[in-house]
């Protein structure tokens, strides 16, 4: 039997914990690396810390089948690139965190 490996919205119990006690699963780390320039001079932790929560996180949803995030944290690296950290409540007591970064989405610039 073969197993298809995917990181799509996987919330495993192997979380890094950000300074504000938000869990960061491997999926979100992978998406940050995938969706930001490879030669970026700002890493994930710095982008998260320098980012700002938006007042109405419900505007940052992915599609109709996924619920809106409880929090959305935006980091813009000038006009070059930017990301949105989509943060949801984590109801799993074994993780030890109240919130988790569900995924990281690139900001498209037009």
Task: Name each model feature, range by range.
Residues 1-110:
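Ribonuclease/tRNase effector modules and their secretory precursors
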């Amino acid at each position: 039997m073969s197993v298809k490996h995917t990181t799509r919205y996987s919330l495993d119990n192997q979380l890094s914990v950000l300074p504000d006690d938000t869990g960061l699963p491997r999926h979100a780390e992978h998406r940050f690396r995938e969706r930001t320039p490879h030669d970026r001079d700002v890493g994930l932790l710095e982008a998260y810390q320098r980012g700002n929560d938006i007042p109405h996180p419900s505007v940052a949803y992915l599609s109709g089948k996924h619920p809106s995030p409880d929090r959305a944290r935006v980091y813009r690296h000038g006009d070059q690139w930017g990301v949105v950290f989509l943060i949801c409540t984590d109801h799993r007591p074994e993780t030890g965190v109240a919130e988790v970064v569900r995924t990281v989405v690139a900001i498209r610039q037009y």
